[in-house]
């Protein structure tokens, strides 16, 4: 018990330290641009607009980090309201991946979608599942750039439904696979840094899946195939 508490305390201290650093960095940049705008009232309009655009981007980045922190806090405290219902997985998966189709086509990705014709129902929260799939697809787009292939596969067995999100990008070395879902895992190339750059992305994804009574798994062979699999309970109708 004391050992687990000590590990949790160390993890929390590390998370607070990293969040403080991640907040300080964009805020310092924002303050720098504001100073420049303040000290140079005669600045050209196009240069002023460029700087204001950067201020906006950094402000959104900071806001995203704060949202991540509070989302994770809610999930881990059990305060997140998450009504569970039957989800038509075919529809949810199809709508989510198709929303990325233009981006993927523009970046030259080959997209593989395998969704069966027969209805497959899972038990979960549609909003949470939507966020999980968005997170994983965004992750694959960012880190699968090398292989230029991305796929979504929906499948089932007698008791569960499975969604595989895969890519052929740089992947994750075996020594890091067990750690990528940890809070604030800060390996330079870790995929846990993809979500708003906060180091909380895959942790939030995992907590959302677990809050729906499911599980998430990862297997990866760098530059060949990386697969995140979301498993939820199957609903028989």
Identify the meaning behind each predicted range:
Residues 85-86, 110-120:
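Conserved catalytic submotifs in the C-terminal HATPase_c
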Residues 140-141:
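Short helix-loop "hinge" at the ATP-lid/N-box region of the Bergerat-fold HATPase_c
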Residues 147-159:
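Short beta-strand/loop element within the Bergerat-fold HATPase_c
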Residues 167:
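Acidic ATP/Mg2+-coordinating residue in the GHKL
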Residues 172-184:
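Short conserved segment of the HATPase_c
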């Amino acid at each position: 018990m004391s050992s687990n508490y000590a590990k949790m305390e160390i993890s929390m201290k590390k998370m607070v330290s990293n969040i403080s650093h991640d907040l300080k960095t964009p805020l310092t940049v924002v303050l720098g641009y504001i100073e420049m705008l303040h000290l140079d009232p005669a600045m050209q309009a196009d240069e002023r607009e460029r700087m204001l655009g950067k201020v906006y981007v950094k402000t959104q980045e900071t806001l995203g980090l704060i949202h991540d922190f509070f989302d994770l806090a809610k999930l881990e405290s059990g305060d997140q309201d998450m009504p569970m219902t039957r989800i038509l997985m075919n529809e949810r998966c199809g709508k989510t991946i198709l929303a990325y189709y233009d981006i993927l086509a523009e970046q030259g990705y080959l997209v593989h979608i395998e969704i069966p014709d027969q209805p497959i129902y899972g038990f979960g929260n549609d909003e949470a599942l939507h966020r999980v799939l968005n997170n994983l697809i965004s992750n694959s787009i960012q880190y699968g750039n090398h292989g230029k292939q991305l796929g979504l596969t929906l499948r089932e067995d007698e008791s569960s439904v499975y969604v595989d999100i895969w890519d052929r990008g740089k992947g994750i070395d075996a020594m890091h696979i067990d750690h990528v879902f940890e809070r604030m895992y800060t390996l330079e190339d870790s995929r846990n840094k993809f979500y708003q750059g906060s180091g909380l992305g895959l942790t939030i994804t995992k907590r959302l899946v677990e809050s729906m009574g499911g599980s998430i798994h990862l297997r990866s062979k760098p530059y060949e195939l990386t697969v995140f699999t979301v498993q939820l309970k199957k609903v028989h109708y």
